[in-house]
């Protein structure tokens, strides 16, 4: 991530096609240890592409990642079935909370 951040920083500063040396210079200026192979991979994969293309490519990859929505839907179904129990538990909890202070008010 730090390599991509350095790359994007350089592009934002006006360098349309940062080189590996440019990325290394930015990271070194921030006292970040540089791994040559990661910098080279970033430069080779971004060669010939502009930042908008890279962002669009990343969005496509992220959209294919499962988000876990089915688990939330299953939880919603069980909550709908047990709605009355939830309301009773909430009322009971509120009653317990009022007894917790044992009639000792903080600002009395």
Swiss-Prot record:
GO molecular function: identical protein binding; structural constituent of ribosome
Gene3D superfamilies the record matches: 1.10.10.1410
GO CC annotations, alphabetized: cytosolic large ribosomal subunit; ribosome
InterPro entries given in the database record: P1/P2_N_sf, Ribosomal_P1/P2, Ribosomal_P2
Pfam families in UniProt: Ribosomal_60s
GO biological process: cytoplasmic translational elongation; protein heterooligomerization; protein homooligomerization
Residue ranges with Low complexity bias: 68-84
Stretch list, region Disordered: 62-108
Keywords: Phosphoprotein, Ribonucleoprotein, Ribosomal protein
Positions carrying Phosphoserine: 98
Listed Acidic residues bias regions: 85-102
Database matches in HAMAP family: Ribosomal_L12_arch (MF_01478)
Task performed by this protein: Plays an important role in the elongation step of protein synthesis.
Family of the protein in this entry: Belongs to the eukaryotic ribosomal protein P1/P2 family.
Name by which UniProt lists this protein: Large ribosomal subunit protein P2A
Organism expressing this protein natively: Candida albicans
